C-alpha cells in the first residue's frame, strides 16, 4: 500500500487523471492525501469533486480556502469574486446538495504518525496534536446545526494572531485562517494575508510561517499546499506541494513511504495566465 500526497488541484481534473496514471494509483490498495483546494478556477471542478468523493476511504482531503469559499457562496455568505471563479457548475448540478454535504464533513487538519496534513500551515504556538484539537472545534461547528451561522461569520482577516483566550466566531476564524490562508507571519505569529507572491516579496518584519523560530510543530512533517508561488518544497519536515498547476505549472504527488516525487505538466486547456 502506498500513500500519495497531492497538491492543489483546483478543478484541473485532466491533470489529476494523468497524475494518478503516472503514480499507478490503485484505489483498492493505495491512498490519496489531498491538501485541499479541490475546486475553483480550473475548468472541471464538478468532475474533480465527484471523483474524490467516489473514492471513499481511498481519498482523504483537508479543506482549503477555495473549498470553504464554495460553501460560503452556496450559503449566501459570499458572492463570486471574478470571472476566474468556476463554481457555478457545482451549484447547478443535480447532486450539488450531496456534494456540499460531503465537503463540509471533511477535516481541515489531519494527523497520522509523524505527518500533519493541512492546507496552508500552522501557527508557531501549535504542535500538530494541538492543531488537530483546534481543527476539531471548527469541524464540529462546520458539521453541526450552526453550520450556516458559522459560514456567515467566517469571512474576514481579524483577529490576525492566536490567543488561548479567544472565543466564539473570532476563535474559529483564526483557526481557519491559519490552516487555510496563511503564508507570512511576524515572529510572534501575527498573520499577513495581502501578499501572495514569492518569498522575496515578504513584507517587512514577516517571514514564511514554516521558518518561524521555535515553531512548535517543527518535529512533525507538515504536508501543505496553498502557496503556488513557493512551488514544490521538500525538506525533512515540510512537503509543500502546490506547484502551480492552475497557472501552467505542474500537479505534484509525493509518495510518503519513500518521498518519491511524481509530476505532470498542466494540461494546456486548464492553465490560467499568470498574474504579474
Curated annotation (Swiss-Prot):
Source organism of this protein record: Dechloromonas aromatica (strain RCB)
GO molecular function, one term: bis(5'-nucleosyl)-tetraphosphatase (symmetrical) activity
HAMAP family registered for this protein in UniProt: ApaH
Free-text function comment from the UniProt entry: Hydrolyzes diadenosine 5',5'''-P1,P4-tetraphosphate to yield ADP.
Protein name: Bis(5'-nucleosyl)-tetraphosphatase, symmetrical
Pfam families per the UniProt record, alphabetical: Metallophos
NCBIfam families: apaH, PRK00166.1
Alphabetically ordered keywords of this record: Hydrolase
Reaction(s) the record says it catalyses: P(1),P(4)-bis(5'-adenosyl) tetraphosphate + H2O = 2 ADP + 2 H(+)
InterPro entries with a match to the protein in the record: ApaH, Calcineurin-like_PHP_ApaH, Metallo-depent_PP-like
Lineage of producing organism: Bacteria, Pseudomonadati, Pseudomonadota, Betaproteobacteria, Rhodocyclales
Top-level taxon in the UniProt lineage: Bacteria
Family to which this protein belongs: Belongs to the Ap4A hydrolase family.
Transmembrane segments: none
EC number: 3.6.1.41
Amino acid at each position: 500500500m502506498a500513500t500519495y500526497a497531492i497538491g492543489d488541484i483546483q478543478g484541473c481534473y485532466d491533470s489529476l487523471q494523468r497524475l494518478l496514471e503516472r503514480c499507478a494509483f490503485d484505489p483498492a490498495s493505495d491512498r490519496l492525501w489531498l491538501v485541499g483546494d479541490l475546486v475553483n478556477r480550473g475548468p472541471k471542478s464538478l468532475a474533480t469533486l465527484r471523483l474524490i468523493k467516489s473514492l471513499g476511504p481511498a481519498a482523504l482531503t483537508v479543506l482549503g480556502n477555495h473549498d470553504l469559499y464554495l460553501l460560503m457562496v452556496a450559503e449566501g455568505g459570499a458572492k463570486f469574486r471574478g470571472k476566474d471563479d468556476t463554481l457555478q457548475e457545482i451549484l447547478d448540478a443535480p447532486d450539488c446538495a450531496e456534494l456540499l454535504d460531503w465537503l463540509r464533513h471533511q477535516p481541515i487538519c489531519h494527523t497520522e504518525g509523524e505527518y500533519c496534513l493541512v492546507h496552508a500551515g500552522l501557527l508557531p504556538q501549535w504542535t500538530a496534536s494541538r492543531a488537530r484539537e483546534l481543527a476539531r472545534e471548527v469541524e464540529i461547528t462546520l458539521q453541526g446545526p450552526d453550520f450556516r451561522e458559522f459560514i456567515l461569520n467566517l469571512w474576514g482577516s481579524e483577529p490576525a494572531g492566536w490567543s488561548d483566550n479567544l472565543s466564539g466566531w473570532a476563535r474559529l476564524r483564526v483557526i481557519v485562517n491559519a490552516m487555510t490562508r496563511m503564508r507570512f507571519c511576524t515572529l510572534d505569529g501575527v498573520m499577513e494575508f495581502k501578499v501572495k507572491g514569492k518569498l522575496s516579496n515578504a513584507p517587512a518584519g514577516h517571514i514564511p510561517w514554516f521558518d518561524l523560530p521555535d515553531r512548535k510543530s517543527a518535529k512533525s512533517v507538515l504536508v501543505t499546499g496553498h502557496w503556488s508561488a513557493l512551488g514544490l518544497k521538500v525538506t525533512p519536515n515540510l512537503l509543500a506541494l502546490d506547484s502551480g498547476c492552475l497557472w501552467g505549472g505542474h500537479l505534484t504527488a509525493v509518495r510518503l513511504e519513500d518521498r518519491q516525487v511524481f509530476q505532470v505538466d498542466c494540461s494546456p486547456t486548464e492553465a490560467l495566465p499568470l498574474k504579474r
